[in-house]
Amino acid sequence: MKKIIVVGATGKLGREVVEGLEKDYEVIKASRSGPDLKIDAFDFESVSDVFASVGPFDGLVSCIGSTPFKTFDELSMEDFATGLSTKCFSQLNLAKAAIPFLSENGSITLTSGIIGDEPILAGSCAAAANGALNMCVSTLAAEYAGKLRINIVSPSIIENSVDYYGMLFDGFEPTSKESIIYAYRRTISAPISGQVLRLTRSS
């Protein structure tokens, strides 16, 4: 049974991913508060130590990251930097720390979002972070070809977050729990790398 670490396991997205993997994989649930591993995705040395405590594993799934939804006029550069760090740099930090511990042809799955491809008002920070992740994965896939696989799942607003975001994603078809589960399972099992699995488009 493959050993998969899911970071962000206690969040809205992470809980659905964990539920979809637990039957067929040994899932280790990680977040700032656990339950299996406590992890600070911004601290490379800390992340490396946590992964070392697990030993070799077969896959990393990152379900972390958020950005501020403000108009460009409202965004400070500090807001922008924080959003990029939280959504993009934290996930790349996890990926970099995981590589020495991954089994041969192991998988890394990061999470971006539809705003990397399709605009919404007040979404400039999300667009920058998601777009950067999407482009970075193709480069990393080339660098690590034959050694490991790295992909991204890019959902729309997920069904269990529609009420939270309200009209911000008006007209976008929510991504279902089933679609989320299939996508993350595919990145773990299928012989693909450098792919952005875009789950839905705006209506």
Residue ranges and their predicted role:
Residues 6-20:
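N-terminal Rossmann NAD(P)H-binding glycine-rich loop of SDR-like oxidoreductase domains
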Residues 71-72, 79-81:
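Substrate-binding pocket helix/loop in short-chain dehydrogenase/reductase
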Residues 30-45:
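Rossmann-fold cofactor-recognition segment
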Residues 83, 93, 107-145, 154-157:
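Catalytic loop of short-chain dehydrogenase/reductase
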Residues 36, 83-84:
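A hydrophobic alpha-helix adjacent to the NAD(P)-binding/active-site core of NAD(P)-dependent oxidoreductases
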Residues 61-70:
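Conserved NAD(P)H cofactor-binding loop of Rossmann-fold oxidoreductase domains
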Residues 152-154, 159-160, 167-203:
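C-terminal helical subdomain
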